């Protein structure tokens, strides 16, 4: 999924989200009763949960948008919870618009 984000803002938004998720990890935040066990910050952020489920946020390289991907090895419900977690963080920035598709 790709929510709209101005080209001049998208890298700042991703940087802000990286900092927020890193902070939430240190606080032991749970997403659908799963803690964040790993964070990779190459070209954005990918975080993994205890059960192997994950979420990813990065800036699109060729259009004014972000790329949001979620995956769960256990359930569609967990995949949606990860998306809701990411979406809430993005909405709080006030710099992200509508998605190009729905989950």
What are the residue ranges of the model-derived segments?
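Phosphate-binding and adjacent anionic-ligand microenvironments
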Residues: 1-69, 75-103
């Amino acid at each position: 999924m790709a929510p709209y984000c101005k080209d001049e803002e998208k890298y700042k938004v991703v940087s802000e989200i990286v900092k927020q998720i890193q902070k939430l990890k240190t606080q032991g935040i749970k997403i659908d009763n799963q803690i964040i066990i790993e964070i990779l910050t190459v070209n954005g952020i990918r975080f993994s949960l205890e059960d192997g489920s994950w979420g990813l946020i990065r800036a699109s390289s060729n259009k004014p948008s972000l790329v949001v991907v979620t995956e769960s090895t256990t359930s569609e419900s967990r995949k949606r919870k990860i998306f809701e977690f990411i979406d809430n963080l993005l909405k709080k920035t006030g710099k992200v618009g509508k998605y190009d598709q729905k989950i």
